[in-house]
Amino acid sequence: MWLKIQVFLLAITLITLGIQAEPNSSPNNPLIEEEARACAGLYKKCGKGASPCCEDRPCKCDLAMGNCICKKKFIEFFGGGK
C-alpha cells in the first residue's frame, strides 16, 4: 500500500512539473509581443520611433510627418504581391 502511495505522489509531481514546463502561449507572452513589434502590418502606425512596415511596404505620413501609416504597395492594388 505504501509503495502505491509513493508511486501516485511521484506521478502527480511529474504531471505538475510537466504542466509548469510548457511554454507560455498566452497573448501576453513577452516573446510574442517583442516579435509582433518587429514590423507594423498594413494600416498600422510606422515611422520614427515606431516599427517599420512589414513586407517592405511604404510608410506614408501626413504633411506634418506626425501620422505615419503602412500602406499597400502599388502592385498590391492589382492583386499582385503577397
Swiss-Prot record:
Tissue-by-tissue expression: Expressed by the venom gland.
Single GO molecular function: ion channel inhibitor activity
GO cellular component terms attached to this protein's record: extracellular region
Keywords: Calcium channel impairing toxin, Disulfide bond, Ion channel impairing toxin, Knottin, Neurotoxin, Secreted, Signal, Toxin, Voltage-gated calcium channel impairing toxin
Disulfide bonds: 39-54, 46-59, 53-70, 61-68
Signal peptide: 1-21
General function of this protein: Antagonist of L-type calcium channels (Cav1/CACNA1). Induces immediate clockwise gyration and flaccid paralysis after 6 hours at dose levels of 5 ug per mouse.
The name this protein goes by in its record: Omega-ctenitoxin-Pn1a
Organism: Phoneutria nigriventer (Brazilian armed spider)
